[in-house]
């Protein structure tokens, strides 16, 4: 079994589930998972986890994300992007400066209402299923955080911008909210995800490129190790005589590591065996003076 992470450059018209299905065929294994849905029309970075790395899917989904989007002003659709049914069209009587002020006003924390065409569940039903049935339900606003907003090009009625945002941010909804603030409406014309955490588009592979690597017996060249997700965490190595504790997912005492370091309570550390094999994420418990396992990644072929 292959254990690791591959950064997919998702192309248009593929769903995230389509990508997972393709990767199962390329890798020849069932244990494959994606780390956050991209709409079929969207392109860009989609980290896919293989084998033991599927345990980090939820962790990657929580990471900050970067997008480049195109906003079409003067158009409103039911899906908040150009794939949906047009609900209203008007001439956007706005200036470039008005657009700039409106867009940049969303930087920081703001309250966003999730779109009906989304995979969020209400009373056990996905919102998009209700929307397709012609039903609309009340959605609670959620706090999202926009760390950076940069206008890349303004050729009215189209505005291209870059955004770095927290998990759970809908760029379609951001586009609609900008249009509403300008009084002319707006919809998302295109979307490309350029980064998920430290994983960037320039390091991504298309499905075709991965198939070519597979055919040439070089697929593992594209696979990142599981611990690449935790690059900011300090490293500890368990001494050889205590490896059995590590293999069983037990707590580890500081003196049972080569470094004997004490880190701040609850600070995550990467725990390795004496042979440099990554085994898991641990956190220090100050009251018990030990490192407790947070999540284990014992790789078994």
Model-assigned labels for residue ranges:
Residues 1-11, 17-34, 38, 42-45, ...:
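Accessory RNA 3′-end/elbow-binding domains used by RNA modification enzymes
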Residues 1-167, 173-205:
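Catalytic cores of RNA-modifying enzymes
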């Amino acid at each position: 079994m292959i254990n690791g992470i591959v950064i997919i450059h998702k192309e248009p018209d593929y769903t995230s589930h389509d990508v997972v299905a393709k990767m199962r065929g390329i890798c020849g294994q069932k244990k494959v998972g994606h780390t956050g849905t991209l709409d079929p029309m969207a392109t860009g970075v989609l980290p896919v986890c293989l084998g033991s790395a599927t345990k980090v899917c939820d962790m990657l989904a929580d990471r900050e994300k970067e997008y480049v989007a195109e906003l079409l002003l003067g158009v409103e659709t039911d899906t908040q992007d150009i794939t949906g049914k047009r609900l209203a069209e008007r001439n956007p009587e706005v200036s470039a400066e008005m657009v700039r002020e409106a867009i940049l006003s969303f930087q920081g924390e703001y309250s966003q209402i999730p779109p009906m065409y989304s995979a969020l569940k209400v009373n056990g039903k996905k919102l998009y299923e209700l929307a397709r049935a012609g039903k609309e339900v009340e959605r609670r606003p959620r706090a999202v955080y926009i760390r950076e907003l940069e206008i890349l090009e303004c050729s009215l009625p189209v505005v291209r911008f870059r955004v770095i945002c927290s998990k759970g941010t809908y760029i379609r909804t951001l586009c609609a909210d900008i249009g509403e603030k300008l009084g002319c409406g707006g919809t998302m014309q295109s979307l490309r995800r350029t980064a998920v955490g430290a994983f960037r588009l320039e390091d991504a592979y298309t499905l075709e490129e991965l198939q070519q690597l597979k055919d040439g017996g070089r697929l593992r060249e594209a696979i990142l190790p599981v611990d690449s997700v935790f690059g900011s965490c300090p490293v500890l190595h368990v001494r050889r005589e205590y490896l059995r504790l590590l293999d069983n997912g037990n707590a580890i005492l500081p003196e049972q590591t080569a470094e004997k370091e004490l880190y701040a309570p609850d600070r995550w550390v990467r725990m390795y065996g004496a042979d440099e094999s990554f085994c898991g994420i641990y956190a220090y418990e100050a009251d018990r003076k030990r490192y407790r396992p947070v999540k284990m990644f014992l790789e078994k072929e």
